[in-house]
């Protein structure tokens, strides 16, 4: 068997910077910094988003960004949608 072909699987401290939550789990991620957590020194890896701050898991859906995207789409491509004729709108009423 060949030696040194597997990555180093170790305990790593992940930090969700948006929610300020720490997770201690095992990973093969390579880090340059370490941090003390609960009395022990661990490799430290900051995260922008995790299950603690992701809108799907927190239930805080952001509708404003979606509405803005739809409005932007309609503004750009609304003219291509084909306009209803006056006869069609009168018949609908």
Swiss-Prot record:
Alphabetized GO MF terms: structural constituent of ribosome
Record's signal peptide: none
GO biological process entries: translation
UniProt cross-references to InterPro entries, sorted A to Z: Ribosomal_bL28/bL31-like_sf, Ribosomal_bL31, Ribosomal_bL31_B, Ribosomal_bL31_sf
Coiled-coil ranges per UniProt: none
Keywords, comma-separated and alphabetical: Ribonucleoprotein, Ribosomal protein
GO cellular component: ribonucleoprotein complex; ribosome
Pfam families: Ribosomal_L31
Disulfide bond entries: none
UniProt family annotation: Belongs to the bacterial ribosomal protein bL31 family. Type B subfamily.
Subunit organization: Part of the 50S ribosomal subunit.
Protein name: Large ribosomal subunit protein bL31B
């Amino acid at each position: 068997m060949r030696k040194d072909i597997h990555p180093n699987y170790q305990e790593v401290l992940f930090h969700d910077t948006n929610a300020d939550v720490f997770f201690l789990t095992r990973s093969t991620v390579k880090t340059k910094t370490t941090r003390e957590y609960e009395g022990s020194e661990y490799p430290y890896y900051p995260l922008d988003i995790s299950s603690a701050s992701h809108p799907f898991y927190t239930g805080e859906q952001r509708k404003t960004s979606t509405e803005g995207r739809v409005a932007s789409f309609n503004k750009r491509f609304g003219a291509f949608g084909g306009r209803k004729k006056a006869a069609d709108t009168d018949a609908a009423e």
